[in-house]
Amino acid sequence: MANLQNYIEYSREVQQARENNQPIVALESTIISHGMPYPQNVEMATTVEQIIRNNGAIPATIAIIDGKIKIGLESEDLEILATNKDVAKVSRRDLAEIVAMKRIGATTVATTMICAAMAGIQFFVTGGIGGVHKGAEHTMDISADLEELSKTNVTVICAGAKSILDLPKTMEYLETKGVPVIGYQTNELPAFFTRESGVKLTSSVETPERLADIHLTKQQLNLEGGIVVANPIPYEHALSKAYIEAIINEAVVEAENQGIKGKDATPFLLGKIVEKTNGKSLAANIKLVENNAALGAKIAVAVNKLL
């Protein structure tokens, strides 16, 4: 463990929270570097961090900078991540290389889970998890996020899986891997920009306290892997299912025609969707992350009270 700590650097705020046993909530950084244009990405990141504070927890945005896994970013780190043109998108397979080469890296859902677990952080807020891509039966394009959820003990609060994915297959994969997917005040898997996907959930809860109970019980039973808390985008910010599906289908065709696949597919598709919705999808994306941040903080606080 001593060697591991050589690679981890805590922000002042996060270090203080650790010393005071305050609840901490992790945030990913790919949404900053690859998910949104500047300066909206910085505004979104600072707003989301503040929402977590307002709900009683401490935010820890995670990124790789100069050979260090940063747990919590100072404002200068955030600027580097938001404006640098050479930020690598880091998943599990890339983590050692990016750290060793002292490059700047933004963490995906999978890597944020890994780094959060290294730092003893049990909760992580994101927009949407990755999953099984459309046509995966031919391409085998399945996000490493799903595999990570099966083995890393972090509870992930999200608005379901990104709506560009094959959601029924994503749920089948999570079921095979034994990952609980729990709807928050919903019986249907939310689909990122929309509240409905047509995919029913077997588990649903009404309060953060109930989620805290489940999280702690799972830990005490030594069950390996994470939990997905599926928190739908608020009604007033949701886009209609038919509208967004038509746009996604157009974007998928464009990606195929241009030969864009693998880790480049998601940023390309999300960028195209922003363009085709005239920015409506970007506004929805920001609102759903803010909504997840509030819930994530409430769950972390509820768990802290039970310890």
Task: Give a label for each model feature.
Residues R195-Q220:
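Anionic-ligand binding region
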Residues A106-T108, E137-S150, V154-E175, P208-D213:
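Active-site glycine-rich loop that binds ribose-phosphate moieties when present
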Residues G225-L288:
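A C-terminal functional module that forms or caps the active site or interfaces directly
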Residues V25-L27, A60-I64, G105, F123-G128, ...:
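General beta-strand structural signal in soluble alpha/beta enzymes
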Residues S29, H34-M36, V42-E97, Q220-E236, ...:
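Glycine-rich nucleotide/cofactor/substrate-binding loop typically near the N-terminus or early
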Residues E74-N153:
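Divalent-metal (Mg2+/Mn2+/Ca2+)-assisted nucleotide/phosphate chemistry catalytic cores
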